[in-house]
Curated annotation (Swiss-Prot):
It comes from the Eukaryota. SUPFAM superfamilies: S-adenosyl-L-methionine-dependent methyltransferases (SSF53335). Keywords: Magnesium, Metal-binding, Methyltransferase, S-adenosyl-L-methionine, Transferase. This is Paraxanthine methyltransferase 2.
Length: 353
């Protein structure tokens, strides 16, 4: 397998940072708040709520959306406790939140922007969430927001020009069945490892809340808005190579370590793993739909998501030039964006078996 660059978001507070350009992800958390509350109310055993309650966010990035996610959970736990015991949770429960991401994540920005007046203690847990990062039975609820789509490696053969799996695109577009199969197999392996690790770390009866985006069954990545914009990124990098701004070899060897699985594929992987029961698989109505169809907003939003990863391979100036071209392509091909097929924004609730 070929190891990719570590995937992180652009840190800091600048106009290109994830901190400033992640309103789309935050909107899903806000839209899902009521369903998160319902899921915790229905599925969290009151016996788990002791005087110390621990929440863990895996793939927290540098904020601020992680704070929304964990606060949604804490609010729901307190509401359930008050309703079922009649006691004030502030008098009886201390909350701790564990923030996990790769060691090169911008934890400084994360901890400098912790919400004032928060009612929880906090700690950082650096490490890959594909592996164990905590002792057994360390927390009661885990959350992953837009992090349940990564693979740890590029599938073997994808970058080999002599292989039938050679993929000229930077992503898994879905149009080459062999490439899709290779990505799905790698995603399945990595997701199984992730679920195995969380099952060890979760308390018995604990919950995992997964929020993110997937494909509806039968829809190909490049038929969606996200896939189309990623195609624009690849085309822009090729344009820069043709102009001599970067090397064609760098473009040809640049592949993303993400796989937007179909809804049915996700369900099958979880069920075959056997460590969790799917308590809910909800379709969340996102207030911004897929993304706002504004070329500038699209370019800025995708730069926050992919910019650091692209910069690690090409350098920051090439990355910036590429996204300038992405905005141009989005404006020139706006009719194409209006014809894309919808993806799916989801909340998956898993209970540890």
């Amino acid at each position: 397998m070929t190891t990719t660059q570590d995937w992180i978001m652009i840190g800091g507070y600048g106009p290109e940072s994830y901190n400033q350009q992640s309103s789309y992800q935050r909107a899903l958390l806000e839209a899902a708040k009521d369903k998160m509350t319902e899921a915790i109310s229905a599925n969290l055993d009151l016996d788990l709520i002791s005087n110390r309650f621990i929440v863990a966010d895996f793939g927290c990035a540098s904020g601020p959306n992680t704070f929304v996610a964990v606060q949604n959970i804490i609010d729901a736990v307190e509401e359930k406790y008050l309703r079922e015991t009649g006691q004030n949770p502030e008098d009886n429960i201390e909350f701790q939140v564990l923030f996990n991401d790769l060691r090169i994540n911008d934890f400084n920005t994360l901890f400098q922007t912790l919400p004032p007046g928060r009612r929880y203690f906090s700690a950082g847990v650096p490490g890959s969430f594909f592996n164990r990062v905590l002792p057994k039975q360390s927390f009661h609820i885990a959350v992953m927001s837009y992090a349940f789509l990564f693979t740890s490696k590029i599938p073997k053969g994808i970058m080999d020009r002599d292989s039938p799996l050679w993929n000229k695109d930077m992503q898994c577009t879905g149009f080459n069945p062999a490439v899709k199969k290779a990505y799905l197999e790698q995603y399945s392996i990595d997701t199984k490892n992730l679920l195995d690790a969380r099952a060890e770390e979760l308390m018995p009866g604990g919950l995992m809340l997964l929020l993110g985006s997937c494909m509806r069954d039968g829809v190909k990545m490049s038929e969606t808005l996200k896939g189309t914009v990623m195609d624009f990124i690849g085309e822009s990098l090729n344009d820069l190579a043709q102009k001599g701004v970067t090397e064609q070899e760098k473009v040809d060897t640049f592949k993303t370590s993400i796989y937007f699985a179909e809804q049915g594929e996700i369900r099958q992987i979880i069920e075959e793993n056997g460590k969790f029961t799917i308590e809910a698989f909800e379709d969340i109505i996102h207030s911004k739909n897929e993304f706002p169809l504004d070329p500038k907003t699209l370019a800025i939003s995708f730069k926050a998501l992919y910019g650091a990863f692209i910069s690690a391979h090409f350098g920051i100036e090439v990355m910036r030039k590429a996204f300038e071209l992405v905005e141009v392509k989005a404006r020139e091909q706006i009719s194409r964006l209006h014809k894309v097929k919808p993806g799916m924004q989801y909340l998956i609730v898993l209970r540890k078996n």
